[in-house]
From Swiss-Prot:
Keywords: ATP synthesis, ATP-binding, Cell inner membrane, Cell membrane, CF(1), Hydrogen ion transport, Ion transport, Membrane, Nucleotide-binding, Translocase, Transport. This is ATP synthase subunit alpha. HAMAP family: ATP_synth_alpha_bact (MF_01346). One of its GO terms (cellular component) is plasma membrane. It catalyses: ATP + H2O + 4 H(+)(in) = ADP + phosphate + 5 H(+)(out). The gene is atpA.
Length: 509
């Protein structure tokens, strides 16, 4: 066997020439100090604002403060394994999360990692969490209803697709219940509605108890609503940076549907806790505090998040993202800093009151203080026809009720108004987990405003409504289908509906 020296030397030369080409270039820095979920890092001169960095042990962080001599990094995870002198690597990527239909039915953390034990998520696409909201040109004014299934909201404070409607109230007034019922109300459309009407739901839990989030997921699962929902959870035991990031992560997941011509609904529960987490991070990063020790850009924090909910025009796929942010007030104080900020950003608010809740008026919506700035353009014509008068009647009823406390001798007209108001208030009550379809709401409210309840005792109103709906669902399906298809009460439908209610009222008495 002869050894060809020339051949071997050529191979060796070739290998030496290509050696070391694949050396990994990564810019690194050193931890100067760490504590309270914040690390100060020396080096990383070219790091971008909002870029992911990696600590030893795979813990991620995000560069937020870029100062002349160091970088302030918030840590997504436990900081107890990070020590002074540790090496920090740049990843070169701005913080992003997985998006797409693969996430439906899953519970994830603020970085999109699954926390429900159902295996990895094989998403085909990732998106940045913090992107610019759509401009003015790609948008269209809100005109399709986003039905919540709650009479008090769909009739009086309608929410449209692409709207941002704030749910505000003290603790334990049923804020989360409104979001949950809205999610459950989408079930019939997902089961047998057209694809273009389907509404995908995202629920972002910020700073909630784990037991509360688990309960929420359990209800969604039991009622078959988890299959079109995504739950993003940054619970009370998660570090502040995760609670700060969760709403943006959820929003990016919702935007995937919006930008693909579909419809999504996102509930942020709740933004007061996100603001508190952001305040904690800002103070630890030594940013100057402002009112109530919140940083100066806490308004911008919420406005850039909520501006991303939009209705896009037909050239851009006609998709929409509807936002239901939640704010928890202290002692019904709507004029505190964060509540006023979010009220001024959103297109209306649903104001829930403790007093109403304890009086048994649930959902505890204060109809006087709640508004929808989109209004009736987010209702179908049939609902406009029946609900037009109900708001005025309830307002008159509230005014009269305040006076009636003083005087006992009231004339017949006032008495009639008070009676009607009491029955309409009773009619707007609704138990949890029982959302109604729009056509059913129209039928019930039609009965209310046309005096069918005036002769009944107040405690009979609920039974009357139940019976009427049962009768319509079995014997008069054509009326409900007519309203659903026509989306308006034509004279023919009105006559049929009137006949159906008349027949039922006779048998009920």
């Amino acid at each position: 066997m002869d050894i060809r020296a020339a051949e071997i030397s050529a191979i060796l030369k070739e290998q030496i020439k290509n050696f070391g080409k694949e050396a990994e270039v990564s810019e690194v820095g050193q931890v100067l100090s760490v504590g309270d979920g914040i690390a100060r890092v020396y080096g990383l001169d070219n790091v971008q604002a909002g870029e992911m960095v990696e600590f030893p042990g795979g813990i991620r962080g995000m560069a937020l403060n870029l100062e002349s001599d160091n970088v302030g990094v918030v840590i997504f995870g436990a900081d107890r394994d990070i020590k002074e002198g540790d090496v920090v690597k740049r990843t070169g990527a701005i913080v992003d999360v997985p998006v797409g239909p693969e996430l439906l039915g899953r519970v994830v953390d603020a970085l999109g990692n699954p926390i429900d034990g159902k295996g990895p998520i094989k998403a085909k696409e990732r998106r940045r969490v913090d992107v610019k909201a759509p401009g003015i040109i790609p948008r269209k004014s809100v005109h399709e209803p986003m039905s919540t299934g709650l009479k008090a909201i769909d009739a009086l404070i309608p929410v449209g697709r692409g709207q941002r409607e704030l749910v505000i109230g003290d603790r334990q007034t049923g804020k989360t219940a409104i979001i949950l019922d809205t999610f459950l109300n989408q079930k019939p459309i997902h089961d047998n509605g057209p694809d273009k009407d389907k509404l995908y739901c995202v629920y972002v839990a910020v700073g909630q108890k784990r037991s509360t989030v688990a309960q929420f997921v359990k209800v969604l699962e039991e009622r078959g609503a988890l299959e079109y929902s995504i739950v993003v959870a940054a619970t009370a035991s998660d570090p502040a940076p995760m609670q700060y990031l969760a709403p943006f992560a959820g929003c990016a997941m919702g935007e995937y549907f919006r930008d693909n011509g579909q419809h999504a609904l996102i509930g942020y529960d709740d933004l007061s806790k996100q603001a508190v987490a952001y305040r904690q991070m800002s103070l630890l990063l030594r940013r100057p505090p402002g009112r109530e020790a919140y940083p100066g850009d806490v308004f911008y924090l919420h406005s850039r998040l909520l501006e991303r909910a939009a209705k896009l025009n037909d050239e851009n796929g006609a998709g929409s993202l509807t936002a239901l942010p939640v704010i928890e007030t202290q002692g019904n104080d709507v004029s505190a800093f964060i509540p006023t900020n979010v009220i001024s950003i959103t297109d209306g608010q649903i104001f829930l009151e403790t007093n109403l809740f304890y009086q048994g008026i649930r959902p505890a919506v204060n109809v006087g203080l709640s508004v929808s700035r989109v209004g009736s353009s987010a209702q179908i014509k049939a609902m406009k026809q029946v609900a037009g008068s109900i708001k005025g009647e309830l307002a008159q009823h509230r005014e009269m009720a305040a006076f009636a406390q003083f005087g006992s001798d009231l004339d017949a007209a006032t008495q009639r108004l008070l009676n009607r108001g009491a029955r309409l208030t009773e009619l707007l009550k609704q138990p949890q987990f029982s959302p109604l379809k729009t056509e059913e709401q129209v039928a019930v409210i039609y009965a209310g405003v046309n005096g069918y309840l005036d002769k009944l005792a107040v405690n009979q109103v609920g039974k009357f409504e139940e019976g009427l709906l049962a009768s319509l669902r079995t014997e008069h399906k054509d009326v409900l289908e007519g309203i659903r298809n026509e989306k308006a009460l034509t004279d023919d439908l009105k006559a049929k509906l009137k006949a159906a209610i008349d027949a039922f009222a006779k048998s009920f008495a």
